[in-house]
């Protein structure tokens, strides 16, 4: 069952399987670095040096010169019909088989959705088919879905038909995934209405002819954010927000769902389906973001030859994603799916637009400097203590943990502390300009509550496993603190240990000047990170036995 860990992430990883000709290699799981040497990416020269990539991260591209059609106009009075094209619409019918619909979805590209109608002559959409639907369907076929009791027979029949290569119509598939109802707007409506809807957590709007249900275009959150970014100079009310750092804007969520990079890919697919997410962060054992997997990546799993990938780790699958992206684009792929609380809104939006992402993982920065965002004073406890906690189970010996520090470019990432989405940004734009969108966090909460009760036991157990890992890390930190104080945890006197434990907790909670000086002498960063760690350790720790 998929582990549900509350966190965040960006990307990077490895492919290549052990050779079957060497018996000794069968039991050896290659490290990321070993696999990377044999990947297609290793045969190409990177498009950027790491220094160039870091410069790009610190100073993302500025907005393009605005479209003269919108210069001087109030963006709230621009019609939604001015932003859409009929060429973005791709149709299938309810009786279209899943295989053909999947091919159409992959070939059509953005906005990554197929509209469904009852007959070829209809111009009214009755439903949609996107990568979330494809992911849910794959899980049913693989027997990894979690149906309610009354759904089990239906799911079993779908899986049997798929194995027997019997065509399955979309009408049997489109109810599998958790999805929003179709939202429509007249093409004559102003953008203010679209921003308010998107800022409430809706991801896609069907634009129709006035007074009809005839679809003339599809407006997505990403398309609207890109429009406002490219034409920012024409919209001062929004443009003035871009230089502000995320911490001061107070947007986003201080919890994000992530998965350990050594977990099987199938668990990531389950997690996205159960939580109604389009992507999740991939993290290492220290919660450093090392990758990003989205439902759109399921297009790499639609061929029979790709089935072995389902048994691979998330780390391995990310390397496949990067290789495929590099081959398709003709250059090395260096995704950057993270920001930190000291990143500006402009920096964040530029990344979202450049990577065509729906969310950026918020991480702690490595160190403050004029050219790089400073380290926020956020402890790891803010992640662990979220109410919808998760489970990152320590990997087994056959699935060795991959350290983010060992991955190419991993040092530009950091520990996951939250997430910022297109919904959050559009909600900010709406509120700033006097609109009244719903809180996007309410949409997230509804999505979480809608998760099937059948998956909850595994969620609870995985959280327990995760807290065990945290306590182990805390114990190691506490041991160091005892050593700083000249104490030893190896004592036969439990009452003495209890007393010293309480004293140490007191130091961790309210460190005195003397202990601060000791930390400043011992720790490379002058004790600042150490003080945060000490407060964090105190959040979730039981006295050592």
From Swiss-Prot:
One term of GO molecular function: protein serine/threonine phosphatase inhibitor activity
Nucleus recorded as keyword: yes
Pfam families: CBS
Keyword Repeat: yes
Residue intervals passing through the bilayer: none
A GO CC term assigned to this protein in UniProt: nucleus
InterPro entries referenced in this protein's UniProt entry, alphabetically: AMPK_gamma/SDS23_families, CBS_dom, CBS_dom_sf, Ssd23
Gene3D superfamilies on file: CBS-domain (3.10.580.10)
Main location: cytoplasm
Residue numbers spanned by region Disordered: 1-27, 433-465
Signal sequence, renumbered to the chain: none
Domain CBS: 83-154, 177-234, 252-309, 366-438
Domain of life per record: Eukaryota
Keywords, alphabetical: CBS domain, Cytoplasm, Nucleus, Repeat
Localization per record: Cytoplasm; Nucleus
UniProt biased composition (Low complexity): 9-25, 451-461
GO BP annotation list: cellular response to glucose starvation; regulation of mitotic metaphase/anaphase transition
Family: Belongs to the SDS23 family.
Function description: Involved in DNA replication and cell separation.
Name of this protein: Protein sds23
Originating organism: Sclerotinia sclerotiorum (strain ATCC 18683 / 1980 / Ss-1)
